[in-house]
UniProtKB/Swiss-Prot annotation:
The lineage of its organism: Bacteria, Bacillati, Bacillota, Bacilli, Lactobacillales. One of its GO terms (molecular function) is 2-succinyl-5-enolpyruvyl-6-hydroxy-3-cyclohexene-1-carboxylic-acid synthase activity. Its EC number is 2.2.1.9. This is 2-succinyl-5-enolpyruvyl-6-hydroxy-3-cyclohexene-1-carboxylate synthase. It comes from Enterococcus faecalis (strain ATCC 700802 / V583). It is an enzyme of class 2 (transferase).
Amino acid sequence: MNHQETMTDYLMAFIEGLKNSGVEQAVISPGSRSTPLALLLHRETAIQTFVDVDERSAAFFALGLSKASQKPVVLLCTSGTAAANYYPAICEANISHVPLVVLTTDRPHELRQVGAPQAMDQLQMYQNHVKLFVEMALPEATEEMLNYAYWQGAKGAAFAQQTPAAPVHLNFPLREPLLPDLERKTKSSQQTALFAGQSILSTEQVQQLADQWYQKNGVLVVGGSHTEEEATLFIQLAEALQWPLLADPLANIVTHGQNSEVVIAHSDLFLNVATLPQEPEVVVRFGSLPISKNIMLWLKRLATTETAFYFVDENGQWQEQLKKSQTVIQAKETTFVEQLLTVVKPTEATWLAQWLLLEKTVSEVLLETLNATELNETTASLAVHQTMKENGQLFVSNSMAIRYLDRFMDSRPYRMFGNRGINGIDGIVSTALGMSAIAPTQQNVLLIGDLALYHDMNGLFLAKRYQLPLTIVLLNNNGGGIFSFLSQRTLREDDFEPLFGTPLDLDFSLVAELYGASYQEVKTIAELKQILQAAAEEPQFQVIEVKGNRQENVHLYESILAEIGRRVERQGISWNG
């Protein structure tokens, strides 16, 4: 058997292992050293392949594919700095528990550390940002080595999915010639069935917790990203306990559509500034903290009181930012909630009533204020939210876009995505396009600011290449709007603008033209809604620009808080805003 046949059989066995453990998509960054894997993946009918010449964009695109499909996705690149460009997306995937299978190809050992071109140290290059690293053996065609190749493929993809899900990295040293034998058929008939368990509490432990919470005034706080089925369980638990439910927007609880009164959608606008008549005796947290800073500050204050904190840690990593929980519960979240639903009992109705009163007051202020406000970043964000269909997918950028929705949106059924692992603005466009590639016939919308769009403009090429009908709503305040809400806003203008305001002064109509997207700048809320509603019925690749003013956003937010404060105080509740 010659080199070409040996390499082909070895790599085909590896790909069989990937398929066996659930891989259905691969994103390929073109290059020479990766030629055999790229060709064999491309020819594999069971794996859908995408090609992106920009490695950073490719990695975030794979991230979006995996987020939306909830399956492992392969990333493949050549040797050298190509692999380094995957780094930001791998870091995000690690923190947000997304299963990427990263395949880097490499020079063989005799060409390392001798000055060979396009060669660098790729061993353990992603360090502790991946949960598994494998330096693959050079291809051999013995039965033992074919089994080895299959096993590493099956193991890698399975490992990436196991709780806590995270990226894995396999590095392939390959010798020339690099062209595989495309006429050969797979020789691996091996199959591996995976039965994965989960962390679960005993019936006695669940009953013990239910007893501790009986007739206690409690709050459920849910962070992280969740499916509709998971969100349903959290809502059912809050209803069974008659406790308020505070959730991150990406938890898809507010966007669940069940419209349950226990879901407190606007807590960010009154927590930590309104003094509740009764404080919670129990706080039960699931996953990471929500995006709301006011929820975080309120919880930090409660942690100094007699309030008992419980932290449900599905991943077993003790990622408890407050470090104040007296009880850590290591269990699969959904299973734990299902167990609780069989034993918990509701608390007194007066506890939830104070939350409902505050929620009603805030909702009335928002309805009156925002309906009377012309088009700006806040009302544009709400227009996007209000025009989402039940099966629609909305990707929300970091910085201000997700905060507008967190503060102001009401209950409406659709699925929301975002990159809230490390919260960067890099790769947002590419991740959103990965999301849309999973369901291209559905409504797919990206809500994004001008800095984030500029940062990932290369990602737009994927929409052009694969005809992905993503509607991009661009909130353009010509710079970094979030800093107008932070302490940096007190700086002199000649310090603030170049370092934090960072105006771009870009004509985004030219960006849309470059990548083949239709473009419109809208001036009214009605015009924006009309375009969004049309796009929901007939999706297309387009950029809708809303030009805003950074200071106007701040003034609107402050005026809303002031009006909420006035009404809350008239109800006899102390307001510290």
